[in-house]
C-alpha cells in the first residue's frame, strides 16, 4: 500500500507537466489534466497503509485530473499515521459515504457532525376522543418545532447490505448501492 501511495504521488507530480515555456498547445493542452474523465483512484482500507504526507493528495487531486476515494471501516484507522493528516483528508473529500457502522464513537461523531441538524416539527400531545364508532387518539392542535440531528447511530448500525447514508454539501441521501451477491456455483471449473 505504501508503494502505491508513493507511485500515486509521483503520477500527480508528473501531471503538473515538465515544461513551463512554449506554446499553449505544447504546455497546457498536452497535460493529462485536460482529460474529460478523471483518473479514478480507490484506496480501500486506507488506514492500514496511511503515510505522513498523504493529506496533500485529495487537496490537489481535482486540479490534477484525479478522482480519489479513501475507504475504510473506521476513522481511528485513518488516524494511525497522523490525526492531523486524517482530519485534512476528511476535510478535502467532498462526498462522504457511511455504510454499516460499528464504531459508535469517533467515526459516528464524524458523520453526525457532517450531517448536522434539521428543523423539524412534531405533535406535542394526543387526545383520546370517543364517538359513535368507538374511541381513538387524535393529535392535539399544537406542535413543537426544534432542531434535531439528521442521523443517529441506530440508523447507521442497522443498515443492511448495500445501504448507505451519502453526504454531499448540505444534502443527506439515504440510498441503496449496488451489492454483488452472486449465488455460489455447484461446480467450479
Task: Give the residues covered by each predicted segment.
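Conserved P-loop NTPase motor cores
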Residues: 1-139, 172-174, 178-188
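P-loop NTPase catalytic cores that bind/hydrolyze ATP
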Residues: 150-185
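Intrinsically disordered, low-complexity acidic Ser/Thr-rich regulatory segments
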Residues: 28-35, 137-159
